[in-house]
């Protein structure tokens, strides 16, 4: 399957994406990760107001194949979580780069985004 990643997205090695949205950062998991998981049946996300730290687990995704932890690509405080994905995990399955986003955070250090892979580098990584 050929994957397409938006140019403004930045990616962690663990397949989470992040991108700046004004002064905030939107976080989700890549289309590649969703494809690898298969049918997603449950998503667990922390409450709004929770602090997350880069590289630490912030929730999990359960599919018919496995339960996988998700890791914060940047540090910050959760200002919004996508409750639609919690109620209907298929939104993550159907549109991981759009309506299936997971969290919006207020980043502690927006420069952490530059430490992540750009779309081209990520595409090469998953193709190797």
From Swiss-Prot:
GO cellular component: cytosol; glycine cleavage complex
Cofactor detail note: Binds 1 lipoyl cofactor covalently.
High-level lineage: Bacteria, Bacillati, Cyanobacteriota, Cyanophyceae, Synechococcales
One BP annotation, GO: glycine decarboxylation via glycine cleavage system
SUBUNIT field: The glycine cleavage system is composed of four proteins: P, T, L and H.
Species for this entry: Prochlorococcus marinus (strain NATL1A)
Name of the molecule in the record: Glycine cleavage system H protein
Alphabetic keyword roster: Lipoyl
Annotated ranges, domain Lipoyl-binding: 24-106
Described purpose of this protein according to its UniProt entry: The glycine cleavage system catalyzes the degradation of glycine. The H protein shuttles the methylamine group of glycine from the P protein to the T protein.
One Pfam assignment: GCV_H
Spans through the membrane: none
């Amino acid at each position: 399957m050929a994957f397409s990643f938006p140019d403004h997205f930045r990616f962690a090695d663990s397949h989470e994406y992040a991108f700046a949205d004004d002064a905030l950062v939107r976080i989700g998991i890549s289309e590649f990760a969703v494809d690898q998981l298969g049918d997603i049946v449950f998503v667990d996300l922390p409450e709004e107001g929770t602090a997350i730290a880069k590289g630490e687990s912030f929730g999990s995704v359960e599919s018919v194949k496995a339960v996988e932890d998700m890791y914060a690509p940047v540090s910050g405080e959760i200002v919004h979580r996508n409750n639609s994905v919690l109620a209907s995990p298929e939104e993550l399955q159907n549109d991981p780069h759009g309506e299936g986003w997971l969290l919006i955070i207020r980043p502690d250090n927006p420069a952490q985004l530059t430490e992540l892979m750009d779309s081209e580098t990520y595409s090469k990584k998953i193709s190797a």
